């Protein structure tokens, strides 16, 4: 089993971990619904992208649900 020859210092350990920090999520306000969404993604609320309808929601009937 591999064992380190020298103890890793707190400074070196923390410098290694500095790349693991999470970054901010870039969100924008949708112009039609006013909800937050990711840029360059289809709106999950109404299925629009670039002010155009690209996804139509399937309306579930009571027979399909049961």
Swiss-Prot record:
InterPro entries: Ribosomal_bL32, Ribosomal_bL32_bact, Ribosomal_zn-bd. One of its GO terms (biological process) is translation. It comes from the Bacteria. The keyword Ribonucleoprotein applies. The keyword Ribonucleoprotein applies. GO terms for molecular function: structural constituent of ribosome. GO terms for cellular component: large ribosomal subunit. Keywords: Ribonucleoprotein, Ribosomal protein. Gene3D superfamilies: Single helix bin (1.20.5.640). Pfam families: Ribosomal_L32p. Disulfide bonds: none annotated. Belongs to the bacterial ribosomal protein bL32 family. This is Large ribosomal subunit protein bL32.
């Amino acid at each position: 089993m591999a064992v380190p020859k020298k103890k890793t210092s707190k400074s070196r350990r923390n410098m290694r971990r500095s790349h693991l920090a999470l970054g901010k999520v870039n969100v924008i306000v949708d112009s039609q619904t006013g909800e937050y969404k990711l840029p360059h993604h289809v709106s999950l609320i109404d299925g629009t992208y670039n002010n155009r309808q690209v996804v139509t929601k399937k309306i579930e009937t009571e027979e399909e649900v049961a």
